[in-house]
Amino acid sequence: MAKRDYYEVLGISKDASKDEIKKAYRKLSKKYHPDINKEEGADEKFKEISEAYEVLSDDNKRATIDQFGHDGPQGFGGQGFNGSDFGGFSGFGGGGFEDIFSSFFGGGSQRDPNAPQKGDDLQYTMTLTFEEAVFGTTKEISIRKDVTCETCHGDGAKPGTSKKTCSYCNGAGHVAVEQNTILGRVRTEQVCPKCNGSGQEFEEACPTCHGKGTENKTVKLEVKVPEGVDNEQQIRLAGEGSPGVNGGPAGDLYVVFRVKPSETFKRDGDDIYYKLNVSFPQAALGDEIKIPTLNNEVMLTIPAGTQTGKQFRLKEKGIKNVHGYGYGDLYVDIKVVTPTKLTDRQKELMKEFAQLNGEEINEQPSNFKDRAKRFFKGE
């Protein structure tokens, strides 16, 4: 099944700016986010929106889509084949059959090795108590990540030294490679493996980062946990990922939450559930019982004749929605508890109650010991 046009998915024109792409994505992702939209198909719609944004926000991927269409650069001029016909063929620097066409037809999807590139995104898993997730908190975390080298400030060269023309590619930034392929011997150009396309090399590499421009360190960060986060949800800390390349922006850090269950409540989204045991007299006669909520205790009125399974709803006594859409509710589920041990007087009263109710009770022992006693008494 062919993919939908990514511009159509986001509802934008093909000459849309990056800001217009981002605005359209934010609007649609908020509308179809699975945590907000429970309608059937919303999850797939959200994935489609995310995929469209991922492609159109990347200049190289967008250029490929604009040049070859949404099915990629496989179909050319009625040749009757595409890249999948050649299985795992990768005779052009590991790029596969599509890269052969890139060489023949102008290389529209090739990336400039000197172009600014965003750094890698990172992920951190944070464990929260139920209370921390409900009310929000601020926590300090320690993560190991690549940071800009303090010695060379990301340049890669030893301070006080300069760069020189790459001796491998003579400053071109790329080298010619000839390879035998199924189409014959083909000459292609590849990024210089020594200078990574810059055309320059160090007189002397930085002694701290050994020319990488980055060093791996433990970094402490303060993370503000918003009220109402749920298990598996995440927040993005912009610019806290790995450093960018060639002056590109740093990546982002995604903090994924693991929320411990509550000993008092069961959570379902923004709603919480509380199990309340009531005695037989309380259920039969009614009562007022003090129950816990997230912030304090309140009195709950139990009407006379309440049965097991009865549910009471306390509006807006649940969890604050993490996106700011009000509060959930607190549901109280009733369970009428049958007494397991009765005094003789209590038994008499229960029998009297049964008689008044027109019931004839054939009392049964509750365990082996009681049955044995009745046997030896001849009952």
UniProtKB/Swiss-Prot annotation:
<keyword id="KW-0863">Zinc-finger</keyword>
<dbReference type="InterPro" id="IPR002939">
    <property type="entry name" value="DnaJ_C"/>
</dbReference>
<dbReference type="Pfam" id="PF00226">
    <property type="entry name" value="DnaJ"/>
</dbReference>
<feature type="zinc finger region" description="CR-type">
    <location>
        <begin position="136"/>
        <end position="218"/>
    </location>
</feature>
<comment type="subunit">
    <text>Homodimer.</text>
</comment>
<protein>
    <recommendedName>
        <fullName>Chaperone protein DnaJ</fullName>
    </recommendedName>
</protein>
<keyword id="KW-0677">Repeat</keyword>
<comment type="function">
    <text>Participates actively in the response to hyperosmotic and heat shock by preventing the aggregation of stress-denatured proteins and by disaggregating proteins, also in an autonomous, DnaK-independent fashion. Unfolded proteins bind initially to DnaJ; upon interaction with the DnaJ-bound protein, DnaK hydrolyzes its bound ATP, resulting in the formation of a stable complex. GrpE releases ADP from DnaK; ATP binding to DnaK triggers the release of the substrate protein, thus completing the reaction cycle.</text>
</comment>
<dbReference type="InterPro" id="IPR036410">
    <property type="entry name" value="HSP_DnaJ_Cys-rich_dom_sf"/>
</dbReference>
<feature type="repeat" description="CXXCXGXG motif">
    <location>
        <begin position="166"/>
        <end position="173"/>
    </location>
</feature>
<feature type="domain" description="J">
    <location>
        <begin position="5"/>
        <end position="69"/>
    </location>
</feature>
<keyword id="KW-0479">Metal-binding</keyword>
<feature type="binding site">
    <location>
        <position position="195"/>
    </location>
    <ligand>
        <name>Zn(2+) 2</name>
    </ligand>
</feature>
<keyword id="KW-0963">Cytoplasm</keyword>
<feature type="repeat" description="CXXCXGXG motif">
    <location>
        <begin position="206"/>
        <end position="213"/>
    </location>
</feature>
<feature type="repeat" description="CXXCXGXG motif">
    <location>
        <begin position="192"/>
        <end position="199"/>
    </location>
</feature>
<dbReference type="GO" id="GO:0051082">
    <property type="term" value="F:unfolded protein binding"/>
</dbReference>
<dbReference type="InterPro" id="IPR012724">
    <property type="entry name" value="DnaJ"/>
</dbReference>
<keyword id="KW-0235">DNA replication</keyword>
<dbReference type="GO" id="GO:0031072">
    <property type="term" value="F:heat shock protein binding"/>
</dbReference>
<feature type="binding site">
    <location>
        <position position="169"/>
    </location>
    <ligand>
        <name>Zn(2+) 2</name>
    </ligand>
</feature>
<dbReference type="GO" id="GO:0008270">
    <property type="term" value="F:zinc ion binding"/>
</dbReference>
<dbReference type="Pfam" id="PF01556">
    <property type="entry name" value="DnaJ_C"/>
</dbReference>
<feature type="binding site">
    <location>
        <position position="192"/>
    </location>
    <ligand>
        <name>Zn(2+) 2</name>
    </ligand>
</feature>
<dbReference type="GO" id="GO:0005737">
    <property type="term" value="C:cytoplasm"/>
</dbReference>
<keyword id="KW-0346">Stress response</keyword>
<dbReference type="InterPro" id="IPR001623">
    <property type="entry name" value="DnaJ_domain"/>
</dbReference>
<dbReference type="GO" id="GO:0005524">
    <property type="term" value="F:ATP binding"/>
</dbReference>
<dbReference type="InterPro" id="IPR036869">
    <property type="entry name" value="J_dom_sf"/>
</dbReference>
<feature type="binding site">
    <location>
        <position position="209"/>
    </location>
    <ligand>
        <name>Zn(2+) 1</name>
    </ligand>
</feature>
<dbReference type="InterPro" id="IPR001305">
    <property type="entry name" value="HSP_DnaJ_Cys-rich_dom"/>
</dbReference>
<comment type="similarity">
    <text>Belongs to the DnaJ family.</text>
</comment>
<dbReference type="GO" id="GO:0006260">
    <property type="term" value="P:DNA replication"/>
</dbReference>
<dbReference type="GO" id="GO:0042026">
    <property type="term" value="P:protein refolding"/>
</dbReference>
<feature type="binding site">
    <location>
        <position position="149"/>
    </location>
    <ligand>
        <name>Zn(2+) 1</name>
    </ligand>
</feature>
<keyword id="KW-0143">Chaperone</keyword>
<feature type="binding site">
    <location>
        <position position="152"/>
    </location>
    <ligand>
        <name>Zn(2+) 1</name>
    </ligand>
</feature>
<dbReference type="GO" id="GO:0051085">
    <property type="term" value="P:chaperone cofactor-dependent protein refolding"/>
</dbReference>
<dbReference type="GO" id="GO:0009408">
    <property type="term" value="P:response to heat"/>
</dbReference>
<dbReference type="Pfam" id="PF00684">
    <property type="entry name" value="DnaJ_CXXCXGXG"/>
</dbReference>
<keyword id="KW-0862">Zinc</keyword>
<dbReference type="InterPro" id="IPR018253">
    <property type="entry name" value="DnaJ_domain_CS"/>
</dbReference>
